[in-house]
């Protein structure tokens, strides 16, 4: 029993092992049978495909044969995806048709058609094509370089005809050595020759062939190096989904072949290829450029490694170790350094850049010129109204009454507008250097130049010789306004003048308050500081004709030009005006005499006193050598009329200017001033000669009414005793009767005055000197006149009416003046 128990497990184990072995053997056999069946199926499918291709070729050959036979028709229908393609092959140099040239068609880089040309160099091919696929046609022949033609269309063609021109190969120089073979091109420049070198052992000659029968061809593919080449180069790269085509720009291209007995020899191995490169800015020694070879199975250029750029004999060369002879090009990949750039393309880029730059520069110049013209036009247009306003103002000034009579029309606004348009610096054309007592008499040319400058000045033609006297004693005068008017030491009656002047300046503060209150009532603002020296004469020194008693005194004292018919009324509007560092009496608003009653003529106060100034050296005779007979200063006199309400002060300035211009050598006979209002010469001015030389003082007073000139007749009966001075000294309105002045006329056209005249010197010096009395020249009637002045200082006595005879005499005098005009007024 024990033995049986031991045998049962052993048998069981052996049975299991057998079962397992059988189970493994059955699947292996089945698998073998399955694998054998798959192989047979694949082989059967391949056989069927080959049979179909053979049948298709037979059909195509049959169709071609039928087309050659006239009148034959094809019974087979052409599929939609097939179109007819005719290829014409010729020689590019001789333009001859090439027969027996191989033509191949590649669709999507797969060869679909391969045929040869007939005797006419043409062949007709049915090409199966689908839209979106690439199409390449190549043609080649022995002795010619292969020519590819990539082509792609978006529409299905029905018929197409193309022509391919083949370049003939260039025979090369072959150098056979014991171990190497060197092939070079036949180029004139040896420095840039391409060369191919390989081992002699790589050449395998056929039987009965000698090495001397070997012929080499090395051709530089110039057609591939042109930018506008129709036969553009297309390269392909292999990736996961398939082939990817890229556009190439070759930098170097070569075709190397070896023939022996008319047959091409295959050389495979390490071949050293050296090609010259085009000079490019983005290519330098050390760069690696991809190498491309033409694949006859795909019909495209395929990348096969990289070559190195080196510099040899100052030239760049591309060296590459090729695996076989054939077609090789050096072309960088698109988007990398040196891709698609050569000298021609750079020249085109530079040309366009220069052209665009020139266009941009011209446009900028045109725009700048347009804006410049527009700016000038706008400036002229804006400046025309101001210029027209200034011209109208000057014409209005010229057309006004140019006599010395005063007008009370308020034109201060017109003057202000004109002054704003003019340069302020022209108004203060002070010649401090010329106003020097030590300076000698100037020349005649200088005097004429200064006079012409006065006449041609633009701003109101105000002759401003020197304003330096304003600042000489301004501090003293501002501290004591009566200091310049008080006499130094008077032996007789100095107190009358002092009392009179103190009474005239006593109410300065009251008048100043009245000035500020009535400033706006008369429609004018403060006077510009540039004109303060014109309107600031505190007193007017006028000389009467009854004081000229002897002819010896006449050349030293001539009357100034006086206002014409009418009197000036000075009321409380006349008060001193203090501005910064200029303080003198300024009458604000003279009122015409027609507004006053006749009783006001009794209110004239005439202070008679023989006054003289200390003799000081001055240069007032500078104009004596060049003064004309008829001094015409229409601009100066005109401004005295226009600048109302300060016409009386401007009249004093006109007199001062004429006195300055008329100083010169003394004349033996008394002369009068003739002022031409319109600039006419002296010969055209009508004047008359009145001989009034008598022994006694006459009551006649002849004056040129139109010219505004006072002419005093000299009297030989007695010497000049004193000058008659009019001083504004009362608070009540005072009237200066200019008719009371005894004036006369003479025939001469030039007035002779000298600086020794004390009254005139006082006027020209701006009133800064002191008034002195000469007791030696006092007349018998002087005391009585002064006593009358003291007696009439009270307001009640000043209101008395003048005698009737005196008024009649004044009326008769004016009648005489009006009946005898000297010149016509245009």
From Swiss-Prot:
The chain crosses the membrane at residues 354-374. It comes from the Eukaryota. It is found in: Cytoplasmic granule; Membrane. The modification Phosphoserine is found at residue 794. Glycans are attached at residues 108, 113, 213, 268. Residues 474-486 have a biased composition (Polar residues). Residues 438-448, 774-786, 805-826 have a biased composition (Basic and acidic residues). GO terms for cellular component: membrane; synapse. Pfam families: FAM171A1-2-B_C (PF20771), FAM171A1-2-B_N (PF10577). Residues 52-71, 429-448, 474-493, 774-826 are annotated as: Disordered. Residues 33-353 are extracellular. Residues 375-826 are cytoplasmic. It is a single-pass type I membrane protein. Residues 1-32 form the signal peptide. Keywords: Glycoprotein, Membrane, Phosphoprotein, Signal, Transmembrane, Transmembrane helix. The keyword Membrane applies. Belongs to the FAM171 family. This is Protein FAM171B. The lineage of its organism: Eukaryota, Metazoa, Chordata, Craniata, Vertebrata.
């Amino acid at each position: 029993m024990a033995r049986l128990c031991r045998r049962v497990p052993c048998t069981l184990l052996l049975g299991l092992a057998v079962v397992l072995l059988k189970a493994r053997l059955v699947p292996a056999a089945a698998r073998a049978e399955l694998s054998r069946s798959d192989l047979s199926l694949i082989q059967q499918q391949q056989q069927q495909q080959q049979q179909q291709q053979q049948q298709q070729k037979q059909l195509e050959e049959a169709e071609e044969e039928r087309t050659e036979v006239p009148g034959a028709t094809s019974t087979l229908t052409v599929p939609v995806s097939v179109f007819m393609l005719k290829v014409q092959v010729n020689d590019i140099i001789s333009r001859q048709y090439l027969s027996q040239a191989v033509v191949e068609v590649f669709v999507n880089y797969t060869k679909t058609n391969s045929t040869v040309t007939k005797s006419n160099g043409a062949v007709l091919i049915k090409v199966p094509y689908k839209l979106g696929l690439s199409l390449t046609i190549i043609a080649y022949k022995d002795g010619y370089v292969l020519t590819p033609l990539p082509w792609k269309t978006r529409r299905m063609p029905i018929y197409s005809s193309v022509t391919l021109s083949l370049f003939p190969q260039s025979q090369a120089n072959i150098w056979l050595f014991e171990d190497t073979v060197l092939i070079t091109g036949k180029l004139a420049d040896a420095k840039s020759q391409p060369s191919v070198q390989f081992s002699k052992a790589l050449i395998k000659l056929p039987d009965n062939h000698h090495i001397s029968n070997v012929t080499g061809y090395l051709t530089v593919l110039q057609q591939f190096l042109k930018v506008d080449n129709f036969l553009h180069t297309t390269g392909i790269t292999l990736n996961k989904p398939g082939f990817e085509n890229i556009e190439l720009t070759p930098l170097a291209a070569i075709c190397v072949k070896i023939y022996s007995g008319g047959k091409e020899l295959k050389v495979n191995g390490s071949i050293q290829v050296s090609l010259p490169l085009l000079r490019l800015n983005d290519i330098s020694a050390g760069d690696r450029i991809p190498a491309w070879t033409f694949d006859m199975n795909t019909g495209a250029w395929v990348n096969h490694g990289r070559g190195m750029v080196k510099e040899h004999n100052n030239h760049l060369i591309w060296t590459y170790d090729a695996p076989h002879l054939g077609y090789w090009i050096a072309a960088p990949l698109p988007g990398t350094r040196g891709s698609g750039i050569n000298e021609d393309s750079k020249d085109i880029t530079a040309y366009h850049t220069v052209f665009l730059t020139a266009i941009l520069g011209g446009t900028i110049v045109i725009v700048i010129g347009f804006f410049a013209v527009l700016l000038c036009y706008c400036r002229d247009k804006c400046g025309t109204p101001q210029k027209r306003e200034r011209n109208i103002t000057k014409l209005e000034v010229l057309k006004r009454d140019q006599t010395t009579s005063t007008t009370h029309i308020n034109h201060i606004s017109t003057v202000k507008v004109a002054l704003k348009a003019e340069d302020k610096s022209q108004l203060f054309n002070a010649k401090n250097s010329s106003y020097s007592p030590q300076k000698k008499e100037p020349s005649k040319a200088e005097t004429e130049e200064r006079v012409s400058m006065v006449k041609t000045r633009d701003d109101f033609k105000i002759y401003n010789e020197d304003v330096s006297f304003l600042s000489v004693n301004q501090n003293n005068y501002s501290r004591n306004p009566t200091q310049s008017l008080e006499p130094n030491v008077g032996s007789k009656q100095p107190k009358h003048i002092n009392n009179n002047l103190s009474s005239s300046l006593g109410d300065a503060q009251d008048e100043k308050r009245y000035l500020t209150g009535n400033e706006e009532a008369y429609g004018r603002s403060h006077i510009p500081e540039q004109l303060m020296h014109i309107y600031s004469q505190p007193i007017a020194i006028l000389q009467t004709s009854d004081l000229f008693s002897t002819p010896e005194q006449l050349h030293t004292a001539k009357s100034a030009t006086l206002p014409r018919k009418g009197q000036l009324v000075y009321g409380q509007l006349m008060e001193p005006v203090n501005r910064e560092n200029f303080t003198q009496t300024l009458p604000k608003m003279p009122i015409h005499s027609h507004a006053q009653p006749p009783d006001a003529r009794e209110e004239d106060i005439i202070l008679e006193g023989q006054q003289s100034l200390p003799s000081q050296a001055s240069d007032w005779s500078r104009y004596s050598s060049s003064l004309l007979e008829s001094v015409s200063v229409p601009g100066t006199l005109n401004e005295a009329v226009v600048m109302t309400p300060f016409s009386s002060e401007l009249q004093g300035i006109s007199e001062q200017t004429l006195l300055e211009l008329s100083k010169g050598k003394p004349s033996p006979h008394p002369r009068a001033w003739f002022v031409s209002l319109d600039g006419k010469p002296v010969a055209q001015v009508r004047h008359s000669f009145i001989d009034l030389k008598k022994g006694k003082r006459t009551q006649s007073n002849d004056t040129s009414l139109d010219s505004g000139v006072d002419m005093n007749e000299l009297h030989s009966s007695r010497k000049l005793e004193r000058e008659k001075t009019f001083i504004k000294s009362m608070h009540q309105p005072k009237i200066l009767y200019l008719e009371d002045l005894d004036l006369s006329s003479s025939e001469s056209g030039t007035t002779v005055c000298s600086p020794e005249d004390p009254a005139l010197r006082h006027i020209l010096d701006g009133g800064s000197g002191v008034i002195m009395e000469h007791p030696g020249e006092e007349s018998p009637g002087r005391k009585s006149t002064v006593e009358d002045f003291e007696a009439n200082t009270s307001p009640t006595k000043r209101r008395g009416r003048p005698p009737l005879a005196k008024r009649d005499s004044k009326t008769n005098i004016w009648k005489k003046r009006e009946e005898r005009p000297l010149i016509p007024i245009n």
